[in-house]
Amino acid sequence: MSLLEFFRPQKKTSASLAKERLQIIVAERRSQNDPAPSYLPQLKEDILKVISKYVAIDPAMVDLTFEHKDDDISVLELNVKLPDEEK
Protein backbone atom coordinates (compact mmCIF):
# COMPACT_ATOMS: atom_id res chain seq x y z
CA MET A 1 0.00 0.00 0.00
CA SER A 2 1.45 3.30 -1.01
CA LEU A 3 1.04 6.52 0.89
CA LEU A 4 -1.39 7.88 -1.73
CA GLU A 5 -3.65 4.83 -1.46
CA PHE A 6 -3.84 5.35 2.28
CA PHE A 7 -5.28 8.86 1.99
CA ARG A 8 -7.38 8.33 -1.13
CA PRO A 9 -10.87 7.02 -0.45
CA GLN A 10 -11.44 3.59 -1.89
CA LYS A 11 -14.29 3.10 -4.32
CA LYS A 12 -16.95 0.68 -3.21
CA THR A 13 -18.11 -1.90 -5.69
CA SER A 14 -21.79 -2.00 -6.52
CA ALA A 15 -22.04 -5.43 -4.88
CA SER A 16 -20.63 -4.23 -1.58
CA LEU A 17 -22.83 -1.15 -1.69
CA ALA A 18 -25.93 -3.27 -2.36
CA LYS A 19 -24.97 -5.64 0.45
CA GLU A 20 -24.55 -2.74 2.87
CA ARG A 21 -27.94 -1.29 1.92
CA LEU A 22 -29.62 -4.67 2.30
CA GLN A 23 -28.10 -5.12 5.75
CA ILE A 24 -29.49 -1.73 6.77
CA ILE A 25 -32.97 -2.68 5.53
CA VAL A 26 -32.89 -6.04 7.32
CA ALA A 27 -31.71 -4.44 10.57
CA GLU A 28 -34.43 -1.80 10.33
CA ARG A 29 -37.15 -4.40 9.82
CA ARG A 30 -35.89 -6.48 12.72
CA SER A 31 -35.98 -3.46 14.99
CA GLN A 32 -39.54 -2.57 13.98
CA ASN A 33 -40.90 -6.02 14.93
CA ASP A 34 -43.05 -6.17 11.83
CA PRO A 35 -46.69 -5.85 12.85
CA ALA A 36 -49.31 -8.39 11.85
CA PRO A 37 -50.39 -8.35 8.21
CA SER A 38 -53.20 -5.97 7.32
CA TYR A 39 -55.44 -8.77 6.03
CA LEU A 40 -55.94 -10.41 9.45
CA PRO A 41 -59.28 -8.69 10.31
CA GLN A 42 -60.72 -9.73 6.94
CA LEU A 43 -59.38 -13.26 7.40
CA LYS A 44 -61.07 -13.51 10.81
CA GLU A 45 -64.33 -12.26 9.33
CA ASP A 46 -64.18 -14.82 6.51
CA ILE A 47 -63.46 -17.63 8.97
CA LEU A 48 -66.45 -16.54 11.07
CA LYS A 49 -68.69 -16.66 7.98
CA VAL A 50 -67.59 -20.19 7.13
CA ILE A 51 -67.99 -21.48 10.69
CA SER A 52 -71.40 -19.82 11.06
CA LYS A 53 -72.68 -21.83 8.07
CA TYR A 54 -72.44 -24.94 10.23
CA VAL A 55 -72.57 -23.76 13.85
CA ALA A 56 -74.15 -20.76 15.59
CA ILE A 57 -71.11 -18.96 16.96
CA ASP A 58 -70.39 -15.69 18.71
CA PRO A 59 -67.49 -13.65 17.21
CA ALA A 60 -65.92 -13.48 20.67
CA MET A 61 -65.47 -17.26 20.51
CA VAL A 62 -62.91 -16.93 17.71
CA ASP A 63 -59.39 -15.81 18.54
CA LEU A 64 -56.90 -15.16 15.74
CA THR A 65 -53.33 -14.19 16.66
CA PHE A 66 -50.20 -13.59 14.63
CA GLU A 67 -46.67 -13.57 15.99
CA HIS A 68 -43.10 -13.66 14.74
CA LYS A 69 -41.02 -16.48 16.19
CA ASP A 70 -37.82 -15.83 14.23
CA ASP A 71 -36.76 -13.76 11.26
CA ASP A 72 -38.14 -16.34 8.86
CA ILE A 73 -40.89 -17.95 10.97
CA SER A 74 -44.32 -16.46 11.58
CA VAL A 75 -47.14 -18.21 13.39
CA LEU A 76 -50.83 -17.70 12.71
CA GLU A 77 -52.87 -19.23 15.54
CA LEU A 78 -56.62 -19.79 15.34
CA ASN A 79 -58.60 -20.80 18.44
CA VAL A 80 -62.31 -21.49 18.04
CA LYS A 81 -64.54 -22.38 20.99
CA LEU A 82 -67.39 -24.38 19.52
CA PRO A 83 -70.74 -24.62 21.33
CA ASP A 84 -72.15 -28.02 22.23
CA GLU A 85 -75.25 -27.68 20.04
CA GLU A 86 -75.36 -27.59 16.25
CA LYS A 87 -77.57 -25.31 14.14
From Swiss-Prot:
The keyword Manganese does not apply. InterPro entries: MinE, MinE_sf. One of its GO terms (biological process) is cell division. Transmembrane segments: none annotated. Pfam families: MinE. It comes from the Bacteria. SUPFAM superfamilies: Cell division protein MinE topological specificity domain (SSF55229). Keywords: Cell cycle, Cell division. The keyword Signal does not apply. Belongs to the MinE family. Prevents the cell division inhibition by proteins MinC and MinD at internal division sites while permitting inhibition at polar sites. This ensures cell division at the proper site by restricting the formation of a division septum at the midpoint of the long axis of the cell. This is Cell division topological specificity factor. The gene is minE.
